[in-house]
Amino acid sequence: MEYKRFKTRQIKVGNVLIGGDAPISVQSMLFTKTRDIEGSLEQINRLYFAGANIVRLACLDMADARALKEIKAKSPLPLIVDIHFNHNLAVYCAEFIDGVRINPGNIGSKENIKEVVKACKERGIPIRIGINHGSIEKQFSDKFGYGVDAMLESAMYNIKLLEDLDFFDIKISMKTSDAQKTIEAYERLRPLCDYPFHLGVTEAGTKFHSTVKSSIALGNLLLKGIGDTMRVSMTGELEEEIRVARAILQDSGVQKSGVNIISCPTCGRIQSDLLSAIKIVEEKTKHIKEPLNISVMGCVVNALGEAKGADVAIAFGKNQGLVIRHGEVVAKLKESELVDRFLAEVEDEVKSRAVKE
């Protein structure tokens, strides 16, 4: 299946391009109190090393806003301020931040939005219209309830409001906590505008539930060419948000990066400690950003076939096994020596590619 992405307008968040032909970026949001400068910077740095492109922070009051200014000066990543209820905080933060997210359901009057637009326009920073099914404006929820129809009405109303103010650096999100409704919301809005979309399932839950919901919703949309930036929302799992997001991009075939591990589910034919080997391989290869296919198989039934499509592979047998690189056996070793040799071949493969580039 050929992947064809919907062509959107391009905006810029700090040094990250979103939309157009830019790669799909991965975002996360801190769970620190923003006034905790040291703690916030610690989480930002963790996200930076995990492979995030953009970070969002909550701003509840002026103490948060002043702290955010200091955090921004030290952050290795572009920062977006997340504003609810108090538009004055958005106006203040627009002086130094890379982007503003507003919730139309609680930001207040048109005059409030005008002030935010004016501040962002002067700085040349984008605004995300963050539609959330749980906080739709009363004028739309009274008429349509809290479903997708109300979300679409809110989105189009707020897009027009910004456009009428001659503001077009816009990004849009249409988040619900339900995978099917999220897919429907983005699909129905896509033909109605050409602004970049920020994908996400809101309040998706802990690691297990979030991974399932986000994979269904985001993977489905990405395969249809919808989406320019994304977040996998996960309760209390910063690095895992990035890891799962990157895996969705990779396994949907949209964006290749990092290691793709092929491993068998195990059965009665296994005569080795495959589970321990897989855990070691996952941990030792998670730092690799180069697109790489590796295979760790427990017996000969599918091992050699999988190895032909892998850059580096292990085929375990009884007390011994093979290390295979690009379909060629490079070593036959005792089981205790296999993983170390395999990892050495993986690192050598990464280095050899770097030299070629």
From Swiss-Prot:
Protein name according to UniProt: 4-hydroxy-3-methylbut-2-en-1-yl diphosphate synthase (flavodoxin)
Residue sites binding [4Fe-4S] cluster per the record: C264, C267, C299, E306
An individual GO BP term: isopentenyl diphosphate biosynthetic process, methylerythritol 4-phosphate pathway
Organism, as annotated: Campylobacter jejuni (strain RM1221)
One Pfam family in the UniProt entry: GcpE
Top-level taxon: Bacteria
Cofactor detail note: Binds 1 [4Fe-4S] cluster.
Primary role: Converts 2C-methyl-D-erythritol 2,4-cyclodiphosphate (ME-2,4cPP) into 1-hydroxy-2-methyl-2-(E)-butenyl 4-diphosphate.
Family: Belongs to the IspG family.
Reaction equation(s) it catalyzes: (2E)-4-hydroxy-3-methylbut-2-enyl diphosphate + oxidized [flavodoxin] + H2O + 2 H(+) = 2-C-methyl-D-erythritol 2,4-cyclic diphosphate + reduced [flavodoxin]
This enzyme's EC code(s): 1.17.7.3
GO molecular function, one term: iron ion binding
Cofactors demanded by this protein: [4Fe-4S] cluster
Annotated pathway: Isoprenoid biosynthesis; isopentenyl diphosphate biosynthesis via DXP pathway; isopentenyl diphosphate from 1-deoxy-D-xylulose 5-phosphate: step 5/6
Assigned keywords, A-Z: 4Fe-4S, Iron, Iron-sulfur, Isoprene biosynthesis, Metal-binding, Oxidoreductase
Top EC class, one word: oxidoreductase
